[in-house]
Amino acid sequence: MAECFRGGKRMKLILLFFLVFAQSPIYAQDNLKFPIEPKMAKEWKYQSDQVMGGVSEGDTSLMQDGDMFYLRLTGDVSTKNNGGFVQFRSKISLFNKPKMFQLIHKTNKEGKGLEGVRLNVKGNGETYHVMIRTYFTWSPSDYYYHTFETSSNWQQVDLPFNQFKSSKYRQRGLEVGQIRDFAVVAYGRDFKSDVSVSEISFY
């Protein structure tokens, strides 16, 4: 009877071990989904080319559609005065490291197992950019980028990290575990911006 009890106890421990460690990757992946919520909207800041003398104008607003919240970037992009962008961005600062970056850096050995970023978006049919900066890109003109198309309906777009392009010739490849700045940008030409994002996730 004692041997049977000890055997049953061992089986329970083995089962507990399996459940904990088998579920851990799923838990980690679930935590790499970042729906836009009021409590985290403050981590996203609007910025335009006016910081460098441009004349583009716009705004980022927290909107709601039923139970879903989203960030909406609207404005007039102008290439006058060497400008040409409006954006909303989240970044690591000296005093703040948003949860999104914390989990990217902790997941899959500093992010090396992640394959791309997925957005739930809608817009006005224009083309927009995701721009990423890492600890190796400190100049404002150094970044990695990927474009995506929009329509008037909500849709998911996948942007594989190995398809991100560098703004600089011979810049080292994008190292996911080093991401420090993430932006959704209306960029590069004269047009009206209207793009909404309800969720950002990493896969």
Task: Set out the residue ranges of the language-model regions.
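Beta-rich carbohydrate-recognition modules and glycan-binding surfaces
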Residues: 26-203
